[in-house]
């Protein structure tokens, strides 16, 4: 079952005070209750989806015994995300985050104008998408798909969630994933949630399996979709095997 995060895709727009990673963890719990009320579930989260799984683990650790039978965290993190370096890569890290926060807050007050400029500068935006989303050369259709998806996300939504990315600090919560088969995957050329984040998650989640996809970028689920599917199939087999021993 797939769903759009709040304020994304076909889901309704969230109020700004509820645009947080913690709220996304609560949303995940609600989706499970409404859509899969009984039986084991396997959680798979990419990027902000992975952060949602981490927040869910912090809020509802008991469900990793009662309901959650396995988890996959793909190109994500539980904290330490340098959003200042991400938005302002040429600025020293110590001043990058304050500048980035100020820049995003200022632009958020003119979100409509920003969205207009994004549409007007589609060629530049497409180049930026290719740079940040992918590592190796990929078909143009992949870049166009991601660029279209990003351009359909209003800047006001980006600005609303931005503070939550910098404040994320939940590595202490991921140990509960050690109780179920867990998979951590990331491309070695990820420029958003770099491979170091996945290595740290793997180190904190006992018995987890780490898969590093050489040369792949942040959108590894597109760039290396066949490998991703193979690893997820293997995780499902591990989950079914463990469920069979209960």
Question: What is the meaning of each model-derived region?
Answer:
Residues 177-178, 184-186, 190:
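Short beta-strand/loop motif that positions the catalytic acidic residue
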Residues 9-66, 78, 84, 230:
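Active-site loop/oxyanion-hole signature of alpha/beta-hydrolase fold enzymes
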Residues 3-7, 76, 215:
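Active-site loop/turn elements of alpha/beta-hydrolase fold enzymes
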Residues 106-176:
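Conserved alpha/beta-hydrolase catalytic His-Asp/Glu region
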Residues 206-246:
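Catalytic active-site module of serine/aspartate enzymes centered on a nucleophile-bearing elbow/loop
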Residues 191-197:
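Conserved alpha/beta-hydrolase "acid-adjacent" motif
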Residues 62, 66-113:
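Flexible "cap/lid" loop of the alpha/beta hydrolase fold
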Residues 43-45, 74, 185:
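Short beta-strand immediately N-terminal to the catalytic nucleophile in serine-hydrolase-like folds
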């Amino acid at each position: 079952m797939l769903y759009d995060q709040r304020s994304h895709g076909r889901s309704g727009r969230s109020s700004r005070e509820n645009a947080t990673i913690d709220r996304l963890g609560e949303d995940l719990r609600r989706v499970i209750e409404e859509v899969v009320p009984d039986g084991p579930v396997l959680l798979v989260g990419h990027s902000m989806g992975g952060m949602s799984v981490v927040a869910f683990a912090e809020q509802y650790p008991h469900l990793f015994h009662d309901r959650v039978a396995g988890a996959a965290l793909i190109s994500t993190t539980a904290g330490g995300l340098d959003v200042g370096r991400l938005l302002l890569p040429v600025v020293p890290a110590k001043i990058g985050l304050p500048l980035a926060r100020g820049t995003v807050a200022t632009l958020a007050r003119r979100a409509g104008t920003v969205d207009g400029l994004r549409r007007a500068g589609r060629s530049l935006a497409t180049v930026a998408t290719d740079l940040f989303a992918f590592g190796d050369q990929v078909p143009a259709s992949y870049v166009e798909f991601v660029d279209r998806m990003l351009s359909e996300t209003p800047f006001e939504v980006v600005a609303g969630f931005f503070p939550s990315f910098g404040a994320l600090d939940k590595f202490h919560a991921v140990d509960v994933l050690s109780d179920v088969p867990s998979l951590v995957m990331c491309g070695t050329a990820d420029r958003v949630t770099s491979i170091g984040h996945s290595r740290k998650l793997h180190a904190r989640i006992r018995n987890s399996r780490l898969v590093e996809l050489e040369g792949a970028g942040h959108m590894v689920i597109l760039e290396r979709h066949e490998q991703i599917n193979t690893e997820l199939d293997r995780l499902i087999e591990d989950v079914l095997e463990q469920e069979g021993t209960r």
